[in-house]
Amino acid sequence: TLINPLYYVYFCRKITAPTTWEIITEKFKSFESNDLFTRSSIPVRKDNSSNIAASVMNWWEDFEQKSLALALEYEFMLSTDISNFYPSIYTHSFEWVFISKEDAKKKKNKNNPGGLIGSHIQMMMNNQTNGIPLGSTLMDTFAELILGQIDIE
């Protein structure tokens, strides 16, 4: 589903309102509290290096070496396939990232960012509650909210 550009701008303004954006960024910061999870910005830029070299070194230092260290520490590894993740996201699950599923069902704290995100994505998807639009950095960011919460739980 392609997002209407006017609606995209409106949605961006809603979620970047100072109070809402602060809650969203705090949630992302909470994902960093577990040393088993690593996040990385792409592309990686370092002084006096080409972007390709910096990206390779970042991968080597942050992912490859850490994976080897964890492989020595743990007996098992869970590997998942999330290739069908975007089309299967339930829009109401954005609320569950910020408040409990039970509170969301009781309609408590309807002003949380998850409710805002879920309802706007649902409108973009012709009021369907399954799936989010593909190909947008904004949707990648929101999908990461759900994946981060899954990692924590």
Regions found by a protein language model. Give the residues of each.
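Conserved two-metal-ion catalytic palm core of "right-hand" nucleic acid polymerases
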Residues: 1-138, 142
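Active-site palm subdomain of RNA-directed nucleic acid polymerases
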Residues: 142-153
